[in-house]
Amino acid sequence: MSDKPDVKEVESFDKTTLKKTTTNEKNTLPTKEVIEQEKSGGSD
């Protein structure tokens, strides 16, 4: 087996077969301010 990967399949890949997807917003981490607010019990 050689060190180089087999790229034959990648080179012949047809991009038109891919489906268009919509990207959803990922859950972002809370800011330091939000964390401090929740720690102090000011979430209500």
Curated annotation (Swiss-Prot):
<feature type="compositionally biased region" description="Basic and acidic residues">
    <location>
        <begin position="33"/>
        <end position="44"/>
    </location>
</feature>
<dbReference type="GO" id="GO:0030334">
    <property type="term" value="P:regulation of cell migration"/>
</dbReference>
<dbReference type="InterPro" id="IPR038386">
    <property type="entry name" value="Beta-thymosin_sf"/>
</dbReference>
<keyword id="KW-0009">Actin-binding</keyword>
<dbReference type="GO" id="GO:0005737">
    <property type="term" value="C:cytoplasm"/>
</dbReference>
<keyword id="KW-0963">Cytoplasm</keyword>
<feature type="compositionally biased region" description="Low complexity">
    <location>
        <begin position="19"/>
        <end position="32"/>
    </location>
</feature>
<protein>
    <recommendedName>
        <fullName>Thymosin beta</fullName>
    </recommendedName>
</protein>
<dbReference type="GO" id="GO:0005856">
    <property type="term" value="C:cytoskeleton"/>
</dbReference>
<keyword id="KW-0206">Cytoskeleton</keyword>
<dbReference type="GO" id="GO:0007015">
    <property type="term" value="P:actin filament organization"/>
</dbReference>
<dbReference type="InterPro" id="IPR001152">
    <property type="entry name" value="Beta-thymosin"/>
</dbReference>
<comment type="function">
    <text>Plays an important role in the organization of the cytoskeleton. Binds to and sequesters actin monomers (G actin) and therefore inhibits actin polymerization.</text>
</comment>
<dbReference type="GO" id="GO:0003785">
    <property type="term" value="F:actin monomer binding"/>
</dbReference>
<dbReference type="Pfam" id="PF01290">
    <property type="entry name" value="Thymosin"/>
</dbReference>
<feature type="region of interest" description="Disordered">
    <location>
        <begin position="1"/>
        <end position="44"/>
    </location>
</feature>
<feature type="compositionally biased region" description="Basic and acidic residues">
    <location>
        <begin position="1"/>
        <end position="17"/>
    </location>
</feature>
<comment type="similarity">
    <text>Belongs to the thymosin beta family.</text>
</comment>
